[in-house]
Amino acid sequence: MTSRLRLPDRLLAIDRALADAGFEHAFGGAIALAYWTLDPRGTSDIDVNVFIPAARCEEALAALPEDIAWSEADVAAIKRDGQVRVWWEEIPVDLFFDYVELHADAARNRRTVPFEGVEIPILGPIELATFKAMFDRTRDWADIEAMLEAETLDAQAVRENLLALIGEGDRRVQRLDETVARA
């Protein structure tokens, strides 16, 4: 079935499906970033954190809109890695499940924001920036810098999260310090 829904409509369908099934969740990535930089950028994917243990991922996968394709290999990847990319036609949907304590913080600190005439949950700025630092991609560091420039980010809280996750010696901690110094 080809739905040709716009990306915002797909995001709202995922939000409704997870909420109707009783799963706490929050959108991350560029969607959340738009609220923390006050400067939206384009995106072609949907990032969603589902606040249940990775071991229970099949329950959440079954609740997603039926056009989102997933397999037993995806279930195995989630149980192993805590995350997976699945597809809704040509749109990637990145799913993240609880596998470290930071996810509990993300659930507690999520915010509700207006989106397309309704309210959706998004990651708070500290958790979003921490996840971005962990991914360690060039664009993620640019996003963190933009959050710092918008003055929506507590850089020390992000640093403390990184120290708890990866330790002082990891280069991502140093890169955060350098990014903060530049901003």
Each predicted region: which residue ranges?
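Compositionally biased terminal segments of proteins
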Residues: 1-183
